[in-house]
Amino acid sequence: MKTKLFINNAWIDSSDQQTFERIHPVSSDVVTESANATVTDAIKAAQAAEEAFKTWKAVGPSERRRLLLKVADVMESKTPKFIEVMAMEVGASALWAGFNVHASANVFREAASLATQIQGETIPTDKAETLSMTLRQPVGPILSIVPWNGTAVLAARAIAYPLVCGNTVVFKGSEFSPATHALITQCVQEAGLPAGVLNYLNSSPDRSPEIADALISAKEIRRINFTGSTRVGSIIAQKAAQHLKRCLLELGGKSPLIVLDDADIDAAVKAAVFGSFLFQGQICMSTERLIVDEKIADEFVAKFVEKTKRLSAGDPCVTGDCIIGPMVSPNSGERINGLFKDAIDKGAKVVCGGLAQGALMPATILDHVKSDMRIYDEETFGPITVVIRCKGEAEAVRIANDSVYGLSSGVFGRDINRALRVGMSIEYGSVHINGSTVQNEAQAPYGGTKNTGYGRFDGRAVIDEFTEIKWLTIEPFEQQYPF
């Protein structure tokens, strides 16, 4: 597959004609050859977005809604293509890729529904014969930097919400998924959005830092949203702060699933398997910690292992219905093996699976994990999860909160009041009582606490993220002033 940059409604090569390759993590075959953007291209994209903003901000809500609904329809019509491309680029199963397209279409439809919900309010004033009000206005060109793992849906939210609020977008895709991100851009183009409203860039890892620097500092860019690692997100936040530009950051996660002693064990096991191993555990809200009451831990682990061993593994390009595919890079396997070996050396027990071989790793469960093990609090981002045994509700809460991250979580227990008490006590942006940690609905705010970042995608929260609030008064000509 070959892809280009998309600037001002034209698919173009990079200004220096250079390309980079996305290599399959197992076969080492070249999957995609992508145009390799330069700083010159990045500035050109920002300028196109600024020029388009002059007219796009004045487009009425009904027209913005119509166009975003059209994008959703176009995306759904290309579902087979998305499944094919995501399997080749990021090892996505048909299940994960199909969900991504469905969720992405929902994001564009939810965004479309917000077109007439961007509202101000009237404010009581002490000034006679004066009307005081607030308005919500678009902020200008938005820089959206998107990762590879939720390949379609994370791009959709970074595009749709700024657009419905009247902004334009410079979309920086991931070097791991250039064809998928170009396909999303193509959907927006086919829906008929005006030139410059969406501009797409991609670049090799060695060029990406200078391109990000150039865009963050560009006078045309007004706000930034980034989904990715906490390390990179922190760098972006610091650079944005130098230019007094607001960020929305959705970063790392170490999501816990708490299983209380009165839980429905079979239901908890189903949620644990789904949350731990969907897309090889490479989801920011994947279940990386099972915090299980010691009274039921043996039964839970036995059933968890039994169900996990039934998961099918393979190459989605060959076996589309497999659940466990390759990780995005052989480097992932090397990193996880380091965490695995450290845990075993310190007393953890392997109850399912084993070491990774390059980008391939079986669904793996470690039991009896303790706080002195690196895997206790380091993000794994692969098909491995851990069981941490606890004594009672209070210790479960303490362990859940013993993390620098705070994205998603789950609590299983039959006593709903008790489960709710636990849910209110843990420091996470999302808490699901008797549900998996892996959940997302376009109408519900999504984000986290602590090192997971700040700001929220989805739901009405995006209106604050992608608009400016303005105080406006209409006053009588004749007024009394003190001098």
From Swiss-Prot:
Stated name of the protein: Salicylaldehyde dehydrogenase
Enzyme Commission number(s) of this protein: 1.2.1.65
Pathway the protein acts in: Aromatic compound metabolism; naphthalene degradation
CDD domains: ALDH_SaliADH (cd07105)
Lineage, uppermost ranks: Bacteria, Pseudomonadati, Pseudomonadota
UniProt KW keywords: Aromatic hydrocarbons catabolism, NAD, Oxidoreductase, Plasmid
Domain of life of the organism encoding this protein: Bacteria
Note: Encoded on an unnamed 75 kb plasmid.
Catalysis performed (reactions): salicylaldehyde + NAD(+) + H2O = salicylate + NADH + 2 H(+)
Uppermost EC category: oxidoreductase
Biological-process GO terms, alphabetical: catabolic process
Active site: E250, C284
An MF annotation (GO) of this entry: salicylaldehyde dehydrogenase (NAD+) activity
Gene (name only): doxF
Binding sites annotated in the UniProt record for NAD(+): G228, S229, T230, R231, V232, G233
Family according to the record: Belongs to the aldehyde dehydrogenase family.
